[in-house]
UniProtKB/Swiss-Prot annotation:
Entry's Gene Ontology BP terms: cellular response to cAMP; cellular response to tumor necrosis factor; gluconeogenesis; glycerol-3-phosphate catabolic process; glycerol-3-phosphate metabolic process; glycerol-3-phosphate shuttle; positive regulation of glycolytic process
UniProt GO cellular component terms: cytosol; extracellular exosome
SUPFAM superfamilies documented for this protein: 6-phosphogluconate dehydrogenase C-terminal domain-like, NAD(P)-binding Rossmann-fold domains
Tissue-specificity statement: Expressed in liver (at protein level).
Disease: Hypertriglyceridemia, transient infantile: An autosomal recessive disorder characterized by onset of moderate to severe transient hypertriglyceridemia in infancy that normalizes with age. The hypertriglyceridemia is associated with hepatomegaly, moderately elevated transaminases, persistent fatty liver, and the development of hepatic fibrosis.
Phosphotyrosine modification, residue list: Y326
Name of this chain's protein: Glycerol-3-phosphate dehydrogenase [NAD(+)], cytoplasmic
Organism annotation: Homo sapiens
Amino acid sequence: MASKKVCIVGSGNWGSAIAKIVGGNAAQLAQFDPRVTMWVFEEDIGGKKLTEIINTQHENVKYLPGHKLPPNVVAVPDVVQAAEDADILIFVVPHQFIGKICDQLKGHLKANATGISLIKGVDEGPNGLKLISEVIGERLGIPMSVLMGANIASEVADEKFCETTIGCKDPAQGQLLKELMQTPNFRITVVQEVDTVEICGALKNVVAVGAGFCDGLGFGDNTKAAVIRLGLMEMIAFAKLFCSGPVSSATFLESCGVADLITTCYGGRNRKVAEAFARTGKSIEQLEKELLNGQKLQGPETARELYSILQHKGLVDKFPLFMAVYKVCYEGQPVGEFIHCLQNHPEHM
């Protein structure tokens, strides 16, 4: 069997952390081609191109400083050139950019290429919810899997122990992806409920914004625990309404579910920015620049998409926590009123 060529589409904080793992494994395992391409959105860093810095210093100095990437990971500034020979495409870009990237890649991929999405977010289609893996799969005509879990990028790059979940309908492909990405400190469970795994990854960012509001307002640990639990209930309810495939509670007990929700509500960037938003009154855009090096936050954007989908279906009242995050972020509702969505939650009626 010919060795599989791998391309990582994206090179932010999480993309670079995954490149470190995938590059290391591809160099050692016969089933993969050792040369791993990584598409890098070209930027100028102190008069040098970011791709040149990565290919000479083997470090993404902007998005994952202090971590060496394996020398077999090659940064390529042209997405078509990076992806055209790949058998496996790993998608890891902010979800608002995926449509444009798919438009560029369409018609340029190998006939038997497959993809895996590490992107946390949802898209609103004309008929309501669209998962990012569906968007990619439909636009590029390739089978898609997903990887979601309690994986804060800097900790993964530091090789601190964590778990993650791959959702893949084809068991053989799931096993291949596990071989490509598993390490002693990055442990993977493969499940077949792709939709549920992916929806967990998108929705938890909205809950984390709520958790950040709690922290910024000084509400304490009991309130934050309630936000996490009520958020989980809304996640499960939303999945049961909108996933086309089966939705079992067991999937929410995997790393993609409750574990990712907890880590994001205590350690992730959505929580951090939401806390600063509640404390300072600065805009989300301003805080993205100050705290995230200009990287985009997924939680508020996902809340906006959820609002659009739920309003279309007449179900806004069933998801008060999701809707409160939307209203605070986009409609100018005072952040201090966030507590009302908890006090009047349908879970308690």
